[in-house]
């Protein structure tokens, strides 16, 4: 399991452009999720989800901490089983102003409820928010 349901990656043939909300400072250029296009991304539990994201680093950093959450009853709830070390997905250090592509693959844990929610990925570097994006998601069995 790896980084960003939301950030810079290598092309996956079936990936479609997904509408996303940038909750950072416009670092993210694009997000593509395997099998998804448009406003809502349907994902299935216990099946791999491939994400490709492009972003520009807003800081020099030697570490990246990743947090992926889903909204549940108005609360941001961490999604279990997500790799939190972004340097395992991207080669650190990152250089400010450089464009990166991240290829992230993760199995949606079976404990995640069947729900329409907003999945948010927050990547933090040594000097604060590195990138943040959110995608409307429908989790199904």
UniProtKB/Swiss-Prot annotation:
It holds the Pfam family E1_DerP2_DerF2. Keywords: Allergen, Disulfide bond, Glycoprotein, Secreted, Signal. Its main location: secreted. Disulfide bonds join 23-132, 36-41, 87-92. It is found in: Secreted. The keyword Secreted applies. Residues 1-15 form the signal peptide. GO terms for biological process: sterol transport. GO terms for molecular function: sterol binding. SUPFAM superfamilies: E set domains (SSF81296). One of its GO terms (cellular component) is extracellular region. CDD domains: Der-p2_like. Glycans are attached at residue 103. Belongs to the NPC2 family. This is Mite group 2 allergen Tyr p 2. It comes from Tyrophagus putrescentiae (Mold mite). The lineage of its organism: Eukaryota, Metazoa, Ecdysozoa, Arthropoda, Chelicerata.
């Amino acid at each position: 399991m790896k980084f960003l349901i939301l950030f810079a990656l290598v092309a996956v043939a079936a990936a479609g452009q997904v509408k996303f909300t940038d909750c950072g400072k416009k670092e993210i250029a694009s997000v593509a999720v395997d099998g998804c296009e448009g406003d809502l991304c349907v994902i299935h539990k216990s099946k791999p989800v491939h994400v490709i994201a492009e972003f520009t680093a807003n800081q020099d950093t030697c570490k990246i901490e990743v947090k992926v959450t889903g909204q549940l009853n108005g609360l941001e709830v961490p999604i279990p089983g997500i790799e939190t070390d972004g340097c395992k997905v991207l080669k650190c250090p990152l250089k400010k102003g450089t464009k990166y592509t991240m290829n992230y693959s993760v199995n949606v844990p079976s404990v995640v409820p069947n729900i329409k929610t907003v999945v948010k990925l927050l990547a933090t570097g040594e000097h604060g928010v590195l990138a943040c994006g959110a995608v409307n998601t429908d989790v199904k069995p």
